[in-house]
Amino acid sequence: MKNLFKLNFLFIIFIFISIFAFPTNSQNTCPSGSLNSTAIPIKIIIASNSIAKNPPLSGMLAGSVCSSITGTITTFTFPNGPIINTVPSGLIGKPIIGKIVLDYLNAKYGLDFSTATISQSSSTVSISISNIVKH
């Protein structure tokens, strides 16, 4: 029962942070091949996800992104790293299955995805989402 209370308390804090934290656009230049020429502010909230048989985890990435689409894969790249990153390190580089909430220029989208992968190299963080279905 105490563990359930702790999880509920942490979830409430996570929701509070996700509502009030929105990044500012720092006018980062995107590389050629991106859909946008300058980085655009975004929040990507992974509301419910799982890896194989592990328990569900949650997290959020927020900052200015460059985006690209290759086939059915949409990639959001934070060129200078996300301003907010509450994604557990155990999710980096592993396939994530579940739902996300995408707040793109304050237009909220609920998305399902078959898989997503978060990658990180030095200060650059990317999330690749395959087969996005908008609700």
Curated annotation (Swiss-Prot):
Entry's transmembrane regions: 59-79
Extracellular topological segments: 27-58
Residue pairs linked by disulfide bridges in the UniProt entry: none
Superkingdom field: Eukaryota
UniProt-annotated location(s): Membrane
Keywords: Glycoprotein, Membrane, Signal, Transmembrane, Transmembrane helix
Main subcellular localisation: membrane
Record's signal peptide: 1-26
Designated name of the protein: Putative uncharacterized protein DDB_G0280341
Species: Dictyostelium discoideum
